Amino acid sequence: MKRSILLSLIGLVIIASGCSSNTYSRLRDQEDRLIANYISRNNLQILKEEPSIDHVWGEKEYYKVTGVDNFYFHLISRGDSVRYDTISSTRIDTVDLEIIANDLIVARYKKFGLTENADTLSYWSTLDQSYPYEFHYTNLSECEATAWHLAIRLMKYPESVCEIIVPSKLGFNAEQSSVTPYVYILKIKVKQ
């Protein structure tokens, strides 16, 4: 009797785990459709190859990042090759200073959903949030949103601004667990 109850419970656990992965699969399919609908609704032009550094981005041009499902990047502003001395608050002018691993990134952002009447979460200015989001570039333990690190690689320079379409698997933990894609407008500086 105990053995048949135990086997029944094991069977239920196996069935339940199979159902939850099917649900996750359906959620991922819905996410893919939501991203495709957003691209279509906004008439975005998708570039298949990474643009050169001096490419002038059209307003609706987005690069579909090679090797990453449903991650799209649009450069709004290239930024400059200037860094700031945080102690004296003076500019340190340099030529073509690219962001490198472990640079301390200071980020401001706006985040909104892909539905037509999506809510917006803004950390764009001190009116929205007193302190910006800070993390070291390429350190996923400080910023688990892989999409941000991918975007910074493409932004290349401090003071850059971009817009990214982020599937849940590349987002923050809360986005990953809810299988919710977002669009971010991301503005970065490098703090020394």
Residue ranges and their predicted role:
Residues M1-C19:
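Sec-dependent bacterial lipoprotein signal peptides
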Residues L6, Y63-G67, C162-I164:
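Short acidic-hydrophobic surface loop/beta-edge motif
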Residues L7-L12, D32, A36, E50-I53, ...:
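Low-complexity, intrinsically disordered short peptide segments enriched in small/polar/basic residues
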Residues C19-D80:
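Acidic/polar, low-complexity intrinsically disordered N-terminal segments immediately downstream
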Residues Y63-V65, F71-V106:
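Short, glycine/small-residue-enriched coil/turn segments at secondary-structure junctions
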Residues L75-R78, D85-T90, F112-Q192:
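A beta-strand/beta-hairpin structural motif
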